[in-house]
């Protein structure tokens, strides 16, 4: 099952991980999208957007109209959600304008600690 991990890490930590992978020449086995704070992660991944990601999981490239149909929502609302997810780098747009979320599963990782 192709999984993407959404996590919270500082930009510095993300760059250190990138440098480690670059030097080793070995990419991680799973994709990872990092956010700078838990607040930013949850601002991007609202309940409606998570539902949309579920509808897009494993579907391949689809039009926004098809994404709306799969999610059971209106096209205008889904268009706004798609714009936010594209801006955050969570989903991609194909050359022909369709959208794609190429994963079957999403793992969310973050730690809340006392300051």
Question: Could you describe each region identified by the protein language model?
Answer:
Residues 54-58:
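Short, locally clustered residues in the helix-turn-helix/winged-helix DNA-binding domain
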Residues 67, 78, 82-86:
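Basic amphipathic alpha-helical segments that dock to polyanions
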Residues 1-21:
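General nucleic-acid-binding
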Residues 74-75:
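The DNA-contacting recognition helix of HTH DNA-binding domains
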Residues 42-46, 63, 95-115:
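Short, cationic-aromatic polyanion-contact patches
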Residues 87-96:
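A short, conserved structural fragment
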Residues 64-71:
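A short acidic, leucine-rich amphipathic alpha-helix
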Residues 23-51:
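Short alpha-helical segments that sit at the start of domains
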């Amino acid at each position: 099952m192709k999984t993407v991990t959404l996590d919270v890490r500082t930009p510095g930590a993300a760059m250190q991980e990138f440098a480690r992978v670059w030097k080793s020449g070995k990419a991680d086995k799973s994709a990872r999208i990092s956010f700078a704070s838990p607040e930013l992660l949850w601002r991007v991944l609202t309940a409606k957007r998570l539902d949309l990601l579920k509808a897009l999981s494993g579907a391949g490239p689809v039009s926004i109209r098809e994404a709306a149909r799969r999610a059971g929502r209106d096209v205008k609302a889904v268009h706004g959600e798609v714009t936010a997810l594209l801006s955050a780098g969570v989903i991609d747009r194909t050359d022909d304008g369709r959208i794609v979320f190429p994963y079957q599963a999403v793992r969310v990782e973050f730690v809340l600690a006392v300051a």
